[in-house]
Amino acid sequence: MELKVDTHTHTYASGHAYSTLIENAKSAKQNGLAMFCTTDHSESMPGAPHYWFFSNQRVLPRFIEDVAIIRGVESNIMNTQGEIDIHPSVDKNLDWVIASFHEPVFRPSDVATHTEALLNVIKGGRVDALGHLGNPNFDFDFEVVIQCAAEHNVAIEINNTTLKGNSRVGSVDRCYEIARIAKAKGAFITTGSDAHFCIDVGGLDLVSSLLGEVGVDSSKVITHSPQQFLAFLVLRGRQSIAEFSVFE
């Protein structure tokens, strides 16, 4: 499946990534992307920036190297109440919010605890996508959470770095099952490289293969085209971005 948008990338601002936004944009262009989301880790992750960093993304140009830039964040799920570590004042300056479990922030627990947290994240309304859900350290009720995500138009991320098998070990088969359930429930799927170095931006080959094997319809993959991604943002209640009228 062709994927023209990468919704999960990091710059050196995350504290453990190694490229600038301009370097990421250059690689995105070389790798055939039309658009990507810049989604550095939010402040509870060791080494991550203060929330002002995310609020000030309003100064970023909408295109770098002729690639569209989506202003985003990978926030941390903090507790079972579904709170995330982004100050509410930042929301108006962001286009895209991922919420993910990370071991340094949320101590792995049991299925019931993780499920409760994810359901409350979804219902809280601030989050557009759930990141790298395949991690076996954060097992959850796939059916219940993905059904809730489908009902609230929250996208399920399939993460290319996870599928390489070196990070979040034990996730690959779980990602296939998550994709199968998302297909059955009619949930939206998003695709992220989770690049921590510029050459990986737009590296979505393993995700593309998975989606093909599972038989997910491209109409439910919001990263199939920039038009589909922007339509999803509007569906989520976000304002249209004037500079992206070129994609209409």
Curated annotation (Swiss-Prot):
The keyword Kinase does not apply. It is an enzyme of class 3 (hydrolase). InterPro entries: Phosphatase_YcdX_put, PHP_dom, PHP_phosphatase, Pol/His_phosphatase_N, Pol/histidinol_Pase-like. Zn(2+) 2 binds at H16, H41, H196. GO terms for biological process: bacterial-type flagellum-dependent swarming motility. Zn(2+) 3 binds at E74, H102, H132. One of its GO terms (molecular function) is zinc ion binding. Keywords: Hydrolase, Metal-binding, Zinc. Zn(2+) 1 binds at H8, H10, E74, D194. GO terms for cellular component: cytosol. Its EC number is 3.1.3.-. Binds 3 Zn(2+) ions per subunit. Its cofactor is Zn(2+). Belongs to the PHP family. This is Probable phosphatase VS_II0429.
